[in-house]
Design a protein with these regions (language model features):
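N-terminal glycine-rich FAD/FM-binding segment characteristic of electron-transfer flavoproteins
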Residues: 1-172
């Protein structure tokens, strides 16, 4: 089972500055880390690979320094890493980010599942995952707390809702 995991390198501090001309984060001199929610997604992708075979492809859109997060993903068990980097991507909103990631996933082609972290700690929007699924025309489930079973081209997940949990089964 081939799993794509979308990851992002984020500032490792809450003390960030914004460039007033470009409205983008000034990343120089700020320690960066792998987004914690993406680390959970990566861990789940590796677990799926260990149980079902296949490979994990970590993908990130960001500046050249985002290679550090991808190297961390390889160390954590990803088999391949892809960095999508271009100055034109600087300051991209979630719609642009999900579009670029969707084009990359379409080019990869050979995947069974795409996992995204719940949200990034630098934006907190949680929009890239659903927008990515919409761009690719694939099912999407938010707030998954556990993948209960994967078999015969389907997956059963448990997701958090206000009143507790909901179990959903879907085709892959």
């Amino acid at each position: 089972m081939n799993v794509v995991v979308c990851i992002k390198q984020v500032p490792g501090t809450t003390e960030v500055a914004i460039d007033p001309q470009t409205n983008t984060l000034i990343r120089e001199g700020v320690k960066s880390i792998l987004n914690p929610f993406d680390a959970y997604a990566l861990e789940e992708g590796v677990r799926i690979k260990e149980q079902h075979g296949g490979k994990v492809i970590a993908i990130s859109m960001g500046p050249p320094q985002a290679e550090e997060a991808l190297r961390e993903a390889i160390t954590a068990g990803a088999d391949e890493a892809i960095l999508l980097s271009d100055r034109a991507f600087a300051g991209s909103d979630t719609l642009a980010t999900s579009y670029v990631l969707a084009k990359a996933c379409a080019k990869i082609g050979d995947y069974d599942l795409i996992i995204c972290g719940r949200q990034t700690i630098d934006g907190d929007t949680g929009q890239v995952g659903p927008e990515l699924a919409e761009n690719l025309g694939i099912p999407f489930v938010a707030y998954v707390s556990k993948i209960e079973e994967i078999k015969d081209g389907s997956m059963r997940v448990r997701r958090m809702i206000e009143e507790g949990y909901e179990v959903i089964e879907m085709s892959l």
